[in-house]
Amino acid sequence: MSYVFRALPKILRNRPNAHIVVVGGDGASYGGPPPDGTTWKQRFIDEVRADISDTDWQRVHFTGLISYDKFISLLQVSRAHIYLTYPFVLSWSLLETMSAGGAILASDTAPVREVIFDDETGLLTDFFDTDALADNLNRLLDDAGLRSRLGAAARQLVLDRFDLEKTCLPQQLQWVDALAQTPAHP
């Protein structure tokens, strides 16, 4: 999240009508809290707030934790979804965004490259390059055809690979059947 925050001043300057919506709680979900007793969110805000005007800051919205239904509704009305993770597991939220046909700008990191193929199912950007993040977001927001094409391809990939009834459940049952037929070792 820190690199998204660091890109905010440029994003807000480049997109004077854009609203940025940040979904999630303030606590540390993966890893520990900051050593000074604050939250990561507050540390990131403190890092960039001086570079963002009060008027622009009013276009940054923090929802906190929201229900699944509200999350899906938000995905359906958003123009772009930024997903940055530095090698960690592939998140359900990315797959949900793909399923909703969202246009995705994601970090070019190992777990993400399993489903986001640059310029096919989304745009990939260097995790550490905040200028590239802002520039790639501009590219995505400037091109409705690109957003539509990437979103449709992302949705199709999720349907092909992760559909519960056609793909996941049959594979799981096959795995359980194979385990059941394996002889037990004394």
Locate each region found by the language model:
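Conserved acidic donor-binding segment of nucleotide-sugar-dependent glycosyltransferases
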Residues: 118-119, 123-130, 139-145
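Short hydrophobic beta-strand element within catalytic cores of glycosyltransferases
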Residues: 103-106
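Short alpha-helical segment that forms part of, or immediately flanks, the ligand-binding pocket
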Residues: 72, 91-99, 113-114, 120
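C-terminal alpha-helical cap of glycosyltransferases
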Residues: 164-186
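A short, well-ordered alpha-helix in the C-terminal region of glycosyltransferases
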Residues: 132, 139, 146-161, 167, ...
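Nucleotide-activated donor-binding/catalytic signature segment of Leloir-type glycosyltransferases, i.e.
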Residues: 28, 33-65, 69
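Short alpha-helical donor nucleotide-sugar binding micro-motif in glycosyltransferases
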Residues: 65, 73-78
